[in-house]
């Protein structure tokens, strides 16, 4: 029917509870999935989930190589849940601010384990385009939503949904968008509700650095390393491949003036240099 004898990625769909995850382990279903992979009918195994706790288990399984996961600035504030309806509630808890730690952990574990993320729900069902329905009280554009998703650690691609040709054009505009048009950071940093103050989102507003540091990448490696009791060897080696290290920071604080989230970058560079030893 598909006029092919193999599929690149075979998907295990909609595993949203830890109980469901445990049920499929060592099951006839999983035996079938592994058999398909052994026969080269599927080349890679993927899984979809809306729950970061389940997705983390998949990323650490050793056999799931790709995760289809819901990512946008609004959903990233939400704590782990088995109930997908919580994502589409009309009102968010007023205490929610910044990226939920479990979701941030997922993105970093995926990057560390070389598990790619394909994004779904990048527009939050269109809510982020309407300031009255957005939890931030401001609207974002499709280009800004796409850029947010693609700048999360481990994200490889995003799937967008369309009803009209104009909506397709709005998404394709990302290919030719300027940095200013992609800029989601200024919008959510200054939003009247649920701002991301104090959190590095790797947006790149800190550039350029007078010491030529890739600040966003250094921050990403620091976040990856501090997830573990000891710095993983792979993270250490990737950090050491950077042309300029955190120890070269001259603490001029020029980057901090540009950071829309008020991150204390010079302080983070000092901590990073101590952590990695350079």
Where are these regions (language model features)?
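Active-site groove signature of glycoside hydrolases
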Residues: 1-20
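Iron-sulfur-cluster electron-transfer modules
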Residues: 240-254, 266, 278
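Beta/alpha (TIM)-barrel catalytic core signal, keyed to glycine-rich beta->alpha loops juxtaposed to Asp/Glu
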Residues: 14-217, 227-241, 267
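Iron-sulfur (Fe-S) cluster-binding segments and ferredoxin-like electron-carrier domains
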Residues: 210-226, 257, 261-275
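Short cysteine clusters
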Residues: 200-209, 249-255, 259
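Short amphipathic alpha-helical surface patches that mediate protein-protein
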Residues: 12, 163, 173, 223, ...
């Amino acid at each position: 029917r598909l006029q092919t004898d193999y599929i690149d990625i075979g998907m295990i769909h909609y595993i949203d509870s830890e109980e469901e995850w445990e049920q499929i382990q060592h099951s006839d279903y999983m035996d079938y999935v592994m058999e398909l992979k052994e026969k080269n009918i599927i080349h890679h195994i993927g899984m979809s989930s809306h729950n970061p706790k389940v997705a983390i288990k998949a990323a650490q399984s050793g056999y799931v190589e790709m995760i289809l996961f819901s990512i946008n600035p609004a959903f990233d504030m939400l704590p782990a849940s088995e109930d997908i309806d919580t994502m589409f509630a009309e009102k968010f808890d007023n205490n929610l601010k910044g990226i939920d730690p479990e979701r941030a952990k997922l993105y970093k574990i995926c990057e560390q384990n070389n598990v790619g993320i394909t994004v779904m729900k990048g527009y939050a069902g269109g809510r982020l385009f309407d300031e009255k329905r957005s939890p931030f009280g401001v609207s974002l554009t499709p280009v800004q939503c796409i850029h947010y998703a693609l700048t999360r650690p481990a994200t490889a691609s995003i799937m967008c949904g369309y009803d009209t040709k104009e909506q397709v054009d709005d998404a394709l505009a990302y290919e030719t968008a300027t940095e200013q048009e992609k800029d989601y950071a200024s919008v959510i940093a200054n939003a009247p509700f649920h701002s991301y103050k104090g959190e590095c989102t790797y947006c790149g507003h800190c550039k350029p650095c007078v010491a030529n540091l890739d600040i966003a990448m250094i921050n990403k490696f620091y976040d990856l390393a501090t997830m573990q009791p000891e710095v993983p060897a792979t993270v250490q080696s990737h950090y050491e491949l950077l042309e300029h290290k955190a120890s070269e920071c001259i603490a001029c604080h020029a980057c901090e003036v540009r950071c829309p989230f008020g991150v204390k970058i010079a302080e983070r560079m000092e901590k990073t240099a101590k952590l990695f030893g350079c």
